[in-house]
Amino acid sequence: MIITTPAPESASDAVAQMYEEDIAADGFVHAYTAAMAVNPEAHDAFVALVRAVVPSIGVRIYEAATLGAARAIGSAHCLIAHGRKSMTAGVVDEAGLRAFAADDDSAFTDAERAVIRYAERLSSSPQDMTDADAAALREHGLTDRQIVDITLAAGLRNHFSRSLMALTVPLDDDPLIAPELAAALRRRAERRAQ
């Protein structure tokens, strides 16, 4: 990592809270949390933006947008973290996530697959997007507000993933996801990075 992160023993109240939330949820402090703890106010603003978009689209669509963006970017951090969150939320099971790592999105609903494609396009060639991209979402009953929030969700993932990559944040061995599944998601991220 190209930065020094706050040590737990000398953490400010805001940083200590970030670390405590990770420990309570996952049993350890993620390296990406430690990196973002350098500026806890910015982290809080990011979390507030996420909380502003999820209500209109729901967790399933949010995770589909997040996973689509993370796969397009090649972010192992976010593929693993949000793969785990997606399994916990019942969006996809382990077999479906393993298939997703192999570019098979069949474990997702038709609407979620459309969101994944939209998020991938936003993350790889946003300058080429047209009304047809939004129309593909509208075909699944998504409203303009939801399309804006899906766009913001994918954009937020680009922001966070690319920031972690630029800061060379190390990838945690996440004990809450099967090692073979984490390895498949890492390999998928590396394919994008080449």
Model regions: which residues?
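Hydrophobic alpha-helical segments
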Residues: 1-194
